[in-house]
């Protein structure tokens, strides 16, 4: 490459090839020499042409619960969550698909760890553009990036989904609901449940972006465990059927505070004793009980906070912010998270709290973190 008259040794190779047996088309981007420039994003291969305003021309995106966008869709596609990073709420599965009537393709990113997509659809169309991009891992492109295209004749979005399912099965990563239930029988208990989302304690730190100094009553809230127990009994008596209670803010620090040092149960709300009564009530009624927990947001206010366990960038800095209720925070390196999970759930078990489930925010929603601390380097 030559940049502003200076030659740099940065080099990469691109390959496009067809597997004869399957007729799948592979696009590969391979870094050869990463000296001279720092690559931020690679947009390759380019977007497919889908330019006509036709209702049966459409695009499939794995955004949140899934999106199907006809080319004449009246609504503009605005910002995609997490900038379309694969394996986040913006792209839960690493593929997208487009159809012109009954003919189309599915593009599967087989190296999704530092990759995502971008898409554009203006109000009323007449087109939808979607393409893949690759980003560095700890400052380097580092490894081969691959997208596999499969052409589909006389098919639709169902065929695209089946092709991805077959791909995942071929990789040994498919796990159906039946297989999950065979491993954890309580998965079947979720069938027919109504989901109830409730909280116990909210406490907003004064330095938090959420803190409202003009309306202090909005910052903090407390509901005793006994109140939640009473509500669950009443719903049961009214014939609500099987319930799953997801409980936020059940611990002493309050919702989104002092993670990963979250126990004990909120004393003001009745402590372990009343939390156990709530859990026992749910079990007696044939309902399910689960908690919200967190092992990513790493709060400065946590007693065990140690900057050495926070995610570190390649320049040595540690990202911080104060967006959530708990105030100033960094991100806990995920290599360390299992130790805190074991510690906290052992404490819950010691206090005889029966849990049917737990939601560990935000591993299945946010982009994966990387950490350049040599003691626990993580890509």
What function would you assign to each model-found segment?
Residues 64-73, 81-84, 242-379:
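Aromatic- and carboxylate-enriched substrate-binding clefts and catalytic-loop regions
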Residues 1-245, 250, 267-269, 285-288:
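Carbohydrate-recognition beta-sandwich/jelly-roll modules
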């Amino acid at each position: 490459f030559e940049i502003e008259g200076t030659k740099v040794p940065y080099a990469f190779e691109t390959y496009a090839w067809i597997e004869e047996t399957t007729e799948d088309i592979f696009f590969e981007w391979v870094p050869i020499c990463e000296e001279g420039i720092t690559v931020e994003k690679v947009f390759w291969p380019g977007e497919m042409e889908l330019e006509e305003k036709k209702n049966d021309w459409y695009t499939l995106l794995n955004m949140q619960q899934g999106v199907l966008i006809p080319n004449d869709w009246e609504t503009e596609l605005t910002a995609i969550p997490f900038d379309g990073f694969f394996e986040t709420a913006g792209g839960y599965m690493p593929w997208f698909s487009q159809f012109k009537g009954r003919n189309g393709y599915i593009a599967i990113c087989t190296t999704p760890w530092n990759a995502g997509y971008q898409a554009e659809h203006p109000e009323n169309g007449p087109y939808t553009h979607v393409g893949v991009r690759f980003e560095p891992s700890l400052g380097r492109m580092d490894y081969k990036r691959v997208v596999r295209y499969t052409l589909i004749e006389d098919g639709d979005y169902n065929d695209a989904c089946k092709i991805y399912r077959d791909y995942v099965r071929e990789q040994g990563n498919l796990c159906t609901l039946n297989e999950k239930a065979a491993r954890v029988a309580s998965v079947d208990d979720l069938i027919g449940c109504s989901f109830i989302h409730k909280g116990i304690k909210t406490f907003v730190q004064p330095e938090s972006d959420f803190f409202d100094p003009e309306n202090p009553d909005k910052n903090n809230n407390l509901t005793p465990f006994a109140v939640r127990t009473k509500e669950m009994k009443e719903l049961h008596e009214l014939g609500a059927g099987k319930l799953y209670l997801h409980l936020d803010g059940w611990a002493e620090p309050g919702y989104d505070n002092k993670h990963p040092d979250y126990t004990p149960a909120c004393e003001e709300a009745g402590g372990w004793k009343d939390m156990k009564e709530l859990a026992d009530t749910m079990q007696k009624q044939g309902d399910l009980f689960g908690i919200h927990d967190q092992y990513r947001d790493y709060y400065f206010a946590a007693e065990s906070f140690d900057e050495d366990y926070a995610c570190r960038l390649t320049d040595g800095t540690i990202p911080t912010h104060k967006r959530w209720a708990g105030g100033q925070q960094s991100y806990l390196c995920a290599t360390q998270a299992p130790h805190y999970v074991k510690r906290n759930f052992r404490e819950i078990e010691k206090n005889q709290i029966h849990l049917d489930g737990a939601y560990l925010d935000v591993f299945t929603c946010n982009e994966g973190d990387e950490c350049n601390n040599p003691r626990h380097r993580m890509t």
